[in-house]
Amino acid sequence: WLGAHTDKIRLGTGIMQIPGRSPANAAMTAMTMDALSGGRFILGLGTSGPQVVEGWHGQPFDRPLTWVREYVQIVRKIIERKEPLVHHGEKYRIPYDGPGSTGQGKPLKSILHGNPEIPIYVGALAPKAQEQAGELCDGLLLTTFNPDAPSYVESNVKRGFEKSERHKDFSTF
């Protein structure tokens, strides 16, 4: 509704829970929402916490930094559409070839031709997660933030910038 009734405001998911949907589902949702909003969509992602991940989604809450890294990498590969998706990581194996696999999964490429630069923001509270956001993402979503301590967050994010080719300026992050 907002996308159809506005033409300047940026629209996005506050934090789409990573355990609640596959990276492909998140990427296709982002591409569709970006198209419907005229290129104004921001994909916000986060892992949530162990209470929700294990209690609601029935998944172990282990290695959240690895989970976020792989998820963002996969989403970017899908929206960039450079080649069919192949990812063999610790959290995701795409196409799946593990126990119970039929062997029929093949590398796929999205048929959606969207904006390959959809911004990805991540919800990150811990210092290492904020550093990872600076490395991998286009912005940071803070659910609890002390406005008297922005230098704390800035220094964490800037450590991530040192590992990234994407960003170097905190003022545009």
How would you describe each model-predicted region?
Residues 1-173:
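Active-site-adjacent structural elements that line small-molecule/cofactor binding pockets in enzymes
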